[in-house]
């Protein structure tokens, strides 16, 4: 069984990791991917102004890619503590860390990021915590968890309170 466990810095996320670790620690053939979505990339790194000169355009494109890669590296370094803490929690619960993979996403749409990672990693199960949602969000279906429940066809979804 391949499980994608979406984590963030919240206390609720910490409880979800504890729950999964204690529930699955003795389950044979289980692989867990800890997945954390970085904050959105700044707008100025999404595209450059362009140029009518093909050589200048190519140079601008290379420069933009380099700046994007540098931003992603910096964000991963500053956010790696989220995955490190989740690993520590799994270890404390007795989970075999040789079956754990760590990965990041970095798009604006967190739910879409989670689904893309679940599909590309061939996960069968997605585990998320339910964050407190306002009455308005509940009525109109807002929030990452609600979006996953609506859009995640072909996956088992565990929502841990």
Enumerate the language-model features and the residues they cover.
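Small/aliphatic-rich secondary-structure junction motif
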Residues: 1-67, 99
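Histidine-centered beta-alpha loop that forms part of the nucleotide-sugar donor binding/catalytic region
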Residues: 8, 131-133, 161
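Solvent-exposed polar/charged
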Residues: 25, 119-120, 150-151
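Short, hinge-like loop/turn segments at secondary-structure boundaries
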Residues: 50-52, 116-119, 144-145
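Structural beta-alpha unit
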Residues: 77, 81-125
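Glycine-rich, Arg-bearing micro-motifs that act as flexible, cationic patches
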Residues: 108-109, 125-150
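Short, flexible loop segments at boundaries between secondary-structure elements
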Residues: 150-161
